[in-house]
Design a protein with these regions (language model features):
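Gly/Gly-Pro- and Ser/Thr-rich, intrinsically disordered tail segments characteristic of DNA damage-repair
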Residues: 1-124
């Protein structure tokens, strides 16, 4: 079943509430089309799956465990560099489109607080 904009809007709103103020603990890229972000709130730990798989693109919380490659791909290393330890500030969506923005407050190499946005455009 294709993911429509209305369903994605409800998912984004629920993620915003559930993951409010969560911090990124880990990032994994189990496959070329999937990114798993482990986020911790004060009381819970969640695994957020961002999947760009053809025919099943989605953003959701998951309890599924994934087998990760021994050597992380370059994209995963880049995401770790810029997002690990970041605090989730906002989850928002482009109205009527299937683009979800995850805004994080992170610390850069100089120790300054910066805002990084991870954009998930879900097609297919």
């Amino acid at each position: 079943m294709a993911l429509d904009a209305a369903t994605l809007a409800l998912t984004a709103a629920e993620l915003k509430t559930t993951l409010a103020d969560a911090k990124i603990a880990k990032l994994f890229e189990p496959t070329r089309d999937e990114l798993v972000i482990t986020l911790r709130t004060r009381t819970e730990t969640y695994s957020l799956l961002l999947s760009a798989r053809s025919g099943s693109a989605r953003v959701c919380l998951t309890e599924e465990s994934f087998e990760n490659p021994e050597t992380p791909p370059s994209f995963c290393m880049l995401m770790r560099k810029h997002l690990t330890g970041g605090r989730l500030l906002d989850v928002r969506m482009e109205p009527g489109d299937r683009i979800v923005y995850f805004e994080f407050q992170c610390t850069n190499e100089m120790g300054d607080l910066v805002r990084n946005i991870l954009c998930a455009e879900l097609m297919g």
